[in-house]
């Protein structure tokens, strides 16, 4: 036996026994794509079991989210309850426990910064100790904490929430938007993720979908979705680059489009680079200038910082279309000398200088993606811009310099990803039949072998789904178990890469080192999620896992979060019922009082007084509406309405009889007149 640490180091004894459909495949197929590969991919895409109902496409963004559905052969972006086509990915919890999502949450962020969560997609699937998370803790007003499993979670009013839960609350809002449009329950969804997301982040996104009550049919990469949106109605074959600089992440993908086949050649990116970093850089500049001018440091004042953050975002957007903007924040803070106001002019050139390093960080991934795809910039027929930050003129100029051509404006940078997700949903549902999507895994996968070396089994930019096996052996005499450590990344040593998970194959018969044959198989599904198995070829003993890191959400965690989400959904339903009942009651009170004033001469005084008492009771009930159910308010309002109807019926009868009486006397006078005329 050897120590546990060395048990992790299985020794490589053989070459790869490839099971990959990409390996040794005949090249005589359609458009250079083998028939075997076509069958392998399409078998998963065109599932035999029929998908019932519409499949919604959701772009779960860092800053904003968007939802679309297929209508015939066209994808339609849906408007939310506020009438907007995108929804802020913001979730807030008020002091009384109410949960707000989208624009209502964003509007109250200034007065409730500590309990308003934004850009939590940057935390999804990440460990608390990750350098990026530690950097983020200094930049946000809310609390990022270490969960019991070591992941980064957030805290509001003493309650902990996983980033998957926060994502689920946003997804529930998108689901509700789709259901309002469709008129029925939306169950199936395709959700997008940044192309450079690792396995943990993809799994956490899928968990968010499950928590929200969605059946996530597929997780697809954002640039690939944008390419679908761009190329669905295009007939010419070409190589395109998708430059996706969004709110929190950056991706670059090189794709080849041929007769409805969208094949990703390579992908690269940075999962911690986006509009949030541009906002943060500008915020730091404003705070620094304000301190230089007034001597007041705003960094300890969360409410003031939130106002500056919102002003920075607004200024950033304005400078995409104008060369100068004013930042005015009256009564931002105060000191012993009185209130302090912020008044600042900011030019586009100044802003570009502040964020130039961030823009430069997108260049190396683009060059690497072209290198991996084995294309030069002259081979690229179109450059597609995706993500709100690509509206910035300096970003567009950088892209033009990098690829040697002006970028295309053929797609809406805010909506293209959701449209592409809806198209993929149409493919899975069988409604779109002339599209085939061949995506890739963004990072290499392998295991830790003797000496802590990272041995790759599947290289980055391998077309998925894919499967590959390799034979390893024991590192010590008499070893009866092997611990398999599964890693993802590009570094030579396993410890420098992302540890996705680990498991142990036990029951290996004692033998000299190098004799047992342990076959490790990696299977990456069409979602980019990894499944691993290890098999002792001598005994046939096998151990299989779907990779779940030491962090991540357990099945019980997800079930509890689903219940909590359902509880919130039920609370939202009750709240909506109560609001509707209150509106109805207030309308009845207003109508009743108006009619009482109008018909006061026809109404008996005692009956009027009784009705006024009913109205007073109704008003008292509405004063304590937060503790009442919608049903109680509705019943009380209905009783008031019935009482008022009876009273007004009496008034109507009285008026009718009066008119009848006056009408009779009028008829008699007319007869007398006629009689006189005849004489």
Swiss-Prot record:
- Omega-N-methylarginine PTM positions read 513
E.C. number(s) listed in UniProt: 3.6.4.10
For the modification Phosphoserine, which residues carry it? 408
A single GO molecular function term of this UniProt record: ubiquitin protein ligase binding
Q: Where is this region: Interaction with FXN and ISCU?
A: 432-679
Q: State if Kinase is listed as a keyword.
A: no
Q: Does the keyword Transferase apply?
A: no
What keywords are assigned to this protein? Acetylation, ATP-binding, Chaperone, Cytoplasm, Hydrolase, Methylation, Mitochondrion, Nucleotide-binding, Nucleus, Phosphoprotein, Transit peptide
- N6-malonyllysine occurs at which residues? 206
A Pfam family that the UniProt record links to this protein: HSP70
Region span, Interdomain linker: 432-441
Residues annotated as transit peptide in the record: 1-46
Renumbered residue ranges of the record's region Interaction with NFS1: 1-432
- Please name the SUPFAM superfamilies in this protein's record: Actin-like ATPase domain, Heat shock protein 70kD (HSP70), peptide-binding domain
- Identify the InterPro entries for this entry: ATPase_NBD, Chaperone_DnaK, Heat_shock_70_CS, HSP70_C_sf, HSP70_peptide-bd_sf, Hsp_70_fam
Functional summary from the UniProt entry: Mitochondrial chaperone that plays a key role in mitochondrial protein import, folding, and assembly. Plays an essential role in the protein quality control system, the correct folding of proteins, the re-folding of misfolded proteins, and the targeting of proteins for subsequent degradation. These processes are achieved through cycles of ATP binding, ATP hydrolysis, and ADP release, mediated by co-chaperones. In mitochondria, it associates with the TIM (translocase of the inner membrane) protein complex to assist in the import and folding of mitochondrial proteins.
**Name of the protein in its database record:** Stress-70 protein, mitochondrial
Species name? Mus musculus (Mouse)
């Amino acid at each position: 036996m050897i120590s546990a640490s060395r048990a992790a180091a299985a020794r490589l004894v053989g070459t790869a026994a490839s099971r990959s459909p990409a390996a040794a495949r005949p090249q005589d197929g359609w458009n250079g794509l083998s028939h075997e590969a076509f069958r392998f991919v399409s078998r998963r895409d065109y599932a035999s079991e029929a998908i019932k109902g519409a499949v919604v496409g959701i772009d779960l963004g860092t800053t904003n989210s968007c939802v679309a559905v297929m209508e015939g052969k066209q994808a339609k972006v849906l408007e939310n309850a506020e009438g907007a086509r995108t929804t802020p990915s913001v979730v807030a919890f008020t002091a009384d426990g109410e949960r707000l999502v989208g624009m209502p949450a964003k509007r109250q962020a200034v007065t409730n910064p500590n309990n308003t969560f934004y850009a939590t997609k940057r935390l999804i699937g990440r460990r608390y100790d990750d350098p990026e998370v530690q950097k983020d803790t200094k930049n946000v007003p809310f609390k990022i904490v270490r969960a019991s499993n070591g992941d980064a979670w957030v805290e509001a009013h003493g309650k902990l929430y996983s980033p998957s839960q926060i994502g689920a609350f946003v997804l529930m809002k998108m689901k509700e938007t789709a259901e309002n449009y469709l008129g029925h329950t939306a169950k199936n969804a395709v959700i997008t993720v940044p192309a450079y997301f690792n396995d943990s982040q993809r799994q956490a996104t899928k968990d968010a979908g499950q928590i929200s009550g969605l059946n996530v049919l597929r997780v697809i990469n954002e640039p690939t979705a944008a390419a679908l949106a761009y190329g669905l109605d295009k007939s010419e074959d070409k190589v395109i680059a998708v430059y996706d600089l969004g709110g929190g992440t950056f991706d670059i993908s090189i794709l080849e489009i041929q007769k409805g086949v969208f094949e990703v050649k390579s992908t690269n990116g940075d999962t911690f680079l986006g509009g949030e970093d541009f906002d943060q850089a500008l915020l730091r500049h404003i705070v620094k200038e304000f301190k230089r001018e007034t001597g007041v440091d705003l960094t300890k004042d969360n409410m003031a910082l939130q106002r500056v953050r919102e002003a920075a975002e607004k200024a950033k957007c304005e400078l995409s279309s104008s060369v100068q903007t004013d930042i005015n924040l009256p009564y931002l803070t105060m000191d012993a000398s009185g209130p302090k106001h912020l008044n600042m002019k900011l030019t586009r050139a100044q802003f570009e200088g502040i964020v130039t390093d961030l823009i430069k960080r997108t260049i190396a991934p683009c060059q690497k993606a072209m290198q991996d795809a084995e294309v030069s910039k002259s081979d690229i027929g179109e450059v597609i811009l995706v993500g709100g930050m690509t509206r910035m003129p300096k970003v567009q100029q950088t892209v033009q310099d990098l690829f040697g051509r002006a970028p295309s404006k053929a797609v809406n940078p805010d909506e293209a990803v959701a449209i592409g997700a809806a198209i993929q949903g149409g493919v899975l549902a069988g409604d779109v039949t002339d599209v085939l999507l061949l995506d890739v895994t963004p990072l290499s996968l392998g295991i830790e072998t003797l000496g802590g070396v990272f041995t790759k089994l599947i290289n980055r930019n391998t077309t998925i789904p894919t499967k590959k096996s390799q034979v390893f052996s024991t590192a010590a005499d008499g070893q009866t178990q092997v611990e398999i450590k599964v890693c993802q990344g590009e570094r030579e040593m396993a410890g420098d890469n992302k540890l996705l998970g680990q498991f142990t194959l036990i029951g290996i018969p004692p033998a000299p080192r190098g004799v047992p044959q342990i076959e490790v198989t990696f299977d990456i599904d069409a979602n980019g999620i990894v499944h691993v198995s290890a098999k002792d070829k001598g005994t046939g003993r096998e151990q299989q896992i779907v990779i779940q890191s030491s962090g991540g959400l357990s099945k019980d965690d997800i079930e509890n979060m689903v219940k909590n989400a359902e509880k919130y959904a039920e609370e939202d339903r009750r709240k909506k019922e109560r609001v509707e009942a209150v509106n109805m009651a207030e309308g009845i009170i207003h109508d009743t009082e108006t009619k009482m004033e109008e018909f006061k001469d026809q109404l008996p005084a005692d009956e009027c007084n009784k009705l006024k008492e009913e109205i007073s009771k109704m008003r008292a009930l509405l004063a304590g509406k937060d503790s009442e159910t919608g049903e109680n308010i509705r019943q009380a309002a209905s009783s008031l309405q019935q009482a008022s109807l009876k009273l007004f019926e009496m008034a109507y009868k009285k008026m009718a009889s009066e008119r009848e009486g006056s009408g009779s006397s009028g008829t008699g006078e007319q007869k007398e007149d006629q009689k006189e005329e005849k004489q």
